[in-house]
Amino acid sequence: MTKRALISVSDKNGIVEFAQELTKLGWEIISTGGTKVALDNAGVATIAIDDVTGFPEMMDGRVKTLHPNIHGGLLARRDVDSHLQAAKDHEIGLIDLVVVNLYPFKETILRPDVTYDLAVENIDIGGPSMLRSAAKNHASVTVVVDPADYPTVLGEIAEQGQTTYPTRQRLAAKVFRHTAAYDALIADYFTKQVGEDKPEKLTITYDLNQPMRYGENPQQNADFYQNALPTDYSIAAAKQLNGKELSFNNIRDADAAIRIIRDFKDRPTVVALKHMNPCGIGQAETIEKAWDYAYEADPVSIFGGIVVLNREVDAATAEKMHPIFLEIIIAPSYSAEALAILTNKKKNLRILELAFDAQDASEVEKEFTGVVGGLLVQDQDVVVESPADWQVVTERQPSEQEWAAMEFAWKSSKYVKSNGIIITNDKMTLGVGPGQTNRVASVRIAIEQAKDRLEGAVLASDAFFPFADNVEEIAAAGIKAIIQPGGSVRDQDSIDMANKYGLTMVFTGVRHFRH
């Protein structure tokens, strides 16, 4: 019995050559619409879909393959006599191979000029139905959704007359992943269209970006997946100009770095980061001077760290960075001279280019945190704050310099692991106290790091002070200005302590926990 293939693709890469080889192997080809035209023009003999169904394509192509003569040919089990008899009785020809890819729904909704009606018209119905029918009956039917699988399928058919069961099973699994992802994108689009922010079912789809050697530790397997709807301002979208592949820990640190730098737009800023905590942040009138401040903030911790800059890296800045061992540098661009300097004898240094203005057009994604048996979903902490909304709660008002330093410190504190404390002036971080289980311990760590540079310094806390002992420690160190969210039942104790020592303290009303 002659084998039959049904081919209907939107991605026509390689399909003519694939069909030509099938016909050489004695296969009949059923085809539809534009695919049939392409094959006919290439001299490949095809059977029109309406010759199989006995029913014309209609409703602008919405109805063409949804027919028993198609799905019966796909779903009939070859090992069940009653199925074969039913096919014979109803003159349904068996179909042994399906090659289908779907209407470009994702590409359509990414178009800047997309309309709702256009998106709806690009929802494929017949394609997924054929794929699912063929995949369900993979014991007998081969189903192909990815042109990358054409050589394997052709090779096995040429060698043994049909594909192997393991290949059919693998391809069926790929199809179900593909159709599930396709439906997930459609569901996400409609969910956003109707403004549903707490759907009772959450289905998200990501595409494999990079297999990884291992995860956070060598004993952990890992891979890097990216959002199926690309986000321009992301590590997945960054262009790598030099160095080894990014590791699992590199990607997490790099992601933390670009989250931090996005809050510093107005002035040239450099952030040095280690284990997802900022170890040095500097801002100035030039990117070179901002680097100087970031490096000076903590010249020890920056070793083996990540540096992100919000302006083009010039030769002068590159000359200063080059002697330092860094894992990654991220910037919107590099001068040719700077790139030559940074890559000289530094083949492992990962240099990434990421357009920072891309964040203006990028959707701010939800954050997902896996827990045993579930998933936590939240908005990113990207609230826009205005110092005009802050409240001075002490008798002493901040000076102009203290206001500038507190604004800088508050932006910086947002990305320190809780309990997070950061000490800065208006140019650079001076001390960082991250991730302690009590806040006063974080205060002490930050003070110890900043101890000889506290003149004119301010301190920021990512959450309120539960007790006045924090303020007492701060005052004893000689720091004169504090910025914190407020909100403790003992706020007045902290205010009284600040007044006792002549400190100024500002409440922002916004907490920035980071676990």
Swiss-Prot record:
GO molecular function: IMP cyclohydrolase activity; phosphoribosylaminoimidazolecarboxamide formyltransferase activity
GO CC list: cytosol
InterPro entries associated with the record: AICAR_Tfase_dup_dom_sf (IPR024051), Cytidine_deaminase-like (IPR016193), MGS-like_dom (IPR011607), MGS-like_dom_sf (IPR036914), PurH-like (IPR002695)
Pathway info: Purine metabolism; IMP biosynthesis via de novo pathway; 5-formamido-1-(5-phospho-D-ribosyl)imidazole-4-carboxamide from 5-amino-1-(5-phospho-D-ribosyl)imidazole-4-carboxamide (10-formyl THF route): step 1/1; Purine metabolism; IMP biosynthesis via de novo pathway; IMP from 5-formamido-1-(5-phospho-D-ribosyl)imidazole-4-carboxamide: step 1/1
All residue ranges annotated as the MGS-like domain in the record: 1-145
Catalysed conversion reaction: (6R)-10-formyltetrahydrofolate + 5-amino-1-(5-phospho-beta-D-ribosyl)imidazole-4-carboxamide = 5-formamido-1-(5-phospho-D-ribosyl)imidazole-4-carboxamide + (6S)-5,6,7,8-tetrahydrofolate; IMP + H2O = 5-formamido-1-(5-phospho-D-ribosyl)imidazole-4-carboxamide
NCBIfam families, per database record: PRK00881.1, purH
Protein family according to the UniProt entry: Belongs to the PurH family.
Record's protein name: Bifunctional purine biosynthesis protein PurH
Gene giving rise to this polypeptide: purH
